């Protein structure tokens, strides 16, 4: 499954581009991805994790493309139900907690960091040792492929 997430008003929107069992031609939908600000990373990771845990496959792997900035601050949202900003230490801690929770449930989680070097320390706090820093997108498939191979070989 390939999906993205963003906040729209009071809602976190999960957009599914491709499902697990879709035909190979569905991969074209991935190119419909557009970036968006305001992301409740912890909630999206928790939701994606529940989807994985419901699957029958033995190995469960979640790959998260991240900029290292979990951030959702309500701006110009009249009558918003959740006015508490999601940013800074609280957002980082929430995201890291959801990652640890999934790992405790034996889901392998890889953070793929494509952000700025100044945010690298935050990425380490969120993902611990299992993250890859992608400086050049051309290396994405090679780096993620190595991680997938390693995860599939463990106890395999």
Question: What are these model-derived regions, one by one?
Answer:
Residues 1-156:
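Acidic, glycine-rich A-domain
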């Amino acid at each position: 499954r390939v999906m993205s997430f963003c906040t729209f008003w009071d809602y976190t929107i999960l957009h599914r581009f491709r499902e697990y069992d879709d035909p190979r031609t569905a991969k074209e939908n991935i190119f419909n991805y557009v970036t968006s600000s305001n992301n409740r990373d912890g909630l999206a990771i928790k939701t994606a994790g529940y989807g994985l845990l419901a699957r029958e496959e033995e190995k469960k792997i979640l790959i998260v493309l991240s900029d290292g900035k979990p951030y959702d601050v309500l701006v110009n949202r009249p009558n918003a139900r959740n006015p508490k900003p999601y940013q800074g230490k609280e957002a980082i801690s929430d995201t890291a907690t959801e990652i640890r929770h999934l790992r405790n449930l034996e889901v392998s989680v890889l953070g793929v960091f494509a952000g700025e070097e100044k945010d690298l320390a935050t990425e380490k706090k969120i993902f611990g040792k299992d993250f890859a820093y992608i400086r050049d997108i051309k290396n994405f498939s090679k780096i993620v492929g190595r991680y997938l191979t390693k995860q599939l070989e463990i106890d395999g």
